[in-house]
Each structure stands twice: as structure tokens, then as C-alpha cells.
Amino acid sequence: MTMSNFARFGAAAVVALFAMSPWVGTANADDPPKAEIDAMRKALSKYEDPYVAVRDLYLSTVGCVHYDGSTMEGHLQYAKGAMGVHFVNLTIQGPPDPLKPNVLIYEPVGNKLKLVAAEWLVPLAVAKERPSLLGQPFQGPMEGHEPLIPQGFHHYDLHAWLFKDNPLGMFSPTNPDVSCKDAQFSLMEMPTKLVAAP
């Protein structure tokens, strides 16, 4: 299977499986309790080994995603920085579970991948209201993040920098201290267009 066919298959699978998931949640801006954050780190620490993540069906999207800080009216504003390489688990469905993120994010460091964050995605089609996790409201709703996720996959998402400090805050989508300089495939993405909530 060629890389472009693999990417198209993966993107289509992301849309299909997430669209079938019933998601719920409410928005609240409270800081998450330290005990819950510690529990998340403990549960997800096994994925510091990316091979364990692959065995648990987290599949790499290959490209290291970063942003130049550009702003565009009507688009989500991402501070200059990177996210990293996303590993997506298409089998995780249902309400956002702090111990089972849909996405693990790795930073390329030399010839290794270092776990830095987790991400949860909620399809707009099944969200009755803005979801939240640990009292943190999700961002969006927004279009899909092309080229990794098709534009038509409207969704909310939330990042949590559990394994690398982020000067912009634990739940900021980008981290200026994450770099894609060691990545074999680097993807400079533009800000994602916001869409209307139902």
C-alpha cells in the first residue's frame, strides 16, 4: 500500500468510526484535580514506548504537525509551536474517557519518538453541546485538520500535555517547546476553520 493510499484509508476510517460514536459532556473551565492528572499519566505511561501504542491499535499518521502562528479570521488561533506526530486509535468510541484518549502525540527526538501529549476528538455530528473533560471545554467546533483529517470531519478536540511541560498551558493545542526538526515528515498546517455549532 502506498503512503498516499495509506493516508486516504486512515483518514476515511477516522471519519467513519468517530461519526458513529455517541459523545457527551459539558463545558467548565475549572483546573483539573492533581490526582486525576496523576492517574492519567500513570495509565498512559506505558505508551512512552510507541511500539506498545501500536500493539494497542494506535496507528501513526506519520507527519509531525507544527504551526507558524499565522492568524486568519474565522479560524482557530494556534500559537507558534508544534503538536508532533499523532497516533490515532480508531477503536476508541463513546464519551471522552481521560484514561483512553483517541490520539497519542509524540515528539521526534533524534531517531526516537517521545510521548508528549494526548488528545480527545468529538464529532460535531453527535455532540449535543460543547464537550469537556476534567472541567476543560473542548476547542471548536472546527473542520478536519487537512491533510491528516478530511475537511468535512467537523469536530471538537482537546489536547493535554501530560508528558511535556507547555509554557502556554497544559490544554493549549500547540507547544512552543515541541519541535519537528528531527522528523522525517514535517507538516506545517494552517489554522483550522471554525464551523457553526448546531
Predicted regions and their residues:
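Sec/Tat signal peptide C-region and signal peptidase I cleavage site
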Residues: 23-29
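Primary mode marks residue(s) on the alpha4-beta5-alpha5 output face of response regulator receiver
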Residues: 30-198
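Bacterial N-terminal signal peptides
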Residues: 12-22
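Short, Lys/Arg-enriched N-terminal segments with co-localized hydrophobic residues
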Residues: 1-2, 25
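Bacterial N-terminal signal peptides that target proteins for export
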Residues: 2-13
